[in-house]
Amino acid sequence: MSINATLLGQAISFALFVWFCIKFVWPPLMNAIEERQKKIADGLADAGRAAKDLELAQAKATEQLKEAKVTANEIIEQANKRKAQIVEEAKAEADAERAKIIAQGKAEIENERSRVKDDLRKQVAALAVLGAERILERSIDQAAHSDIVDKLVAEI
């Protein structure tokens, strides 16, 4: 095999091509590849941070939901206690009012009874006086006396 000028020219051309590529083509390609690798690494790191942030946010949301449920249950419990208290107060007030009304009714009945007794005593006294007057007007005869007493008893 003989080395001729064509082969030597091709070798020199290839060497110049390689030098040109190393000097002018290779650095921008490497920069582009490195930038792309950096973007991918940053994207993966961001995705990892986002996943952690999402996990933290979900944990926080779950905790807040639990706290909200506890708070809601406490509020409901307080409302139920207040409701029971209001009902008890209303019952006590109603019982007091009922007792007051009953006491007033009993007092009115007692007053009316006393008034009726007084009226009845007055009427009995009036009838007794009337009977005594009639007895005194008539002669003190036993038959007349019995007749007047029977009439008085019938009137009473």
Swiss-Prot record:
Listed transmembrane segments: 7-29
GO cellular component: plasma membrane; proton-transporting ATP synthase complex
Localization, UniProt: Cell inner membrane
Oligomer and partners: F-type ATPases have 2 components, F(1) - the catalytic core - and F(0) - the membrane proton channel. F(1) has five subunits: alpha(3), beta(3), gamma(1), delta(1), epsilon(1). F(0) has three main subunits: a(1), b(2) and c(10-14). The alpha and beta chains form an alternating ring which encloses part of the gamma chain. F(1) is attached to F(0) by a central stalk formed by the gamma and epsilon chains, while a peripheral stalk is formed by the delta and b chains.
Membrane topology reported for the UniProt record: Single-pass membrane protein
Gene3D superfamilies: 6.10.250.1580
Entry keyword Transferase: no
Stated family: Belongs to the ATPase B chain family.
Domain of life: Bacteria
Keyword tRNA processing: no
Keyword field: ATP synthesis, Cell inner membrane, Cell membrane, CF(0), Hydrogen ion transport, Ion transport, Membrane, Transmembrane, Transmembrane helix, Transport
Function comment: F(1)F(0) ATP synthase produces ATP from ADP in the presence of a proton or sodium gradient. F-type ATPases consist of two structural domains, F(1) containing the extramembraneous catalytic core and F(0) containing the membrane proton channel, linked together by a central stalk and a peripheral stalk. During catalysis, ATP synthesis in the catalytic domain of F(1) is coupled via a rotary mechanism of the central stalk subunits to proton translocation. Component of the F(0) channel, it forms part of the peripheral stalk, linking F(1) to F(0).
GO molecular function annotations of the record: proton-transporting ATP synthase activity, rotational mechanism; proton-transporting ATPase activity, rotational mechanism
Protein name (record): ATP synthase subunit b
UniProt source species: Shewanella sp. (strain W3-18-1)
Predominant localisation class: membrane
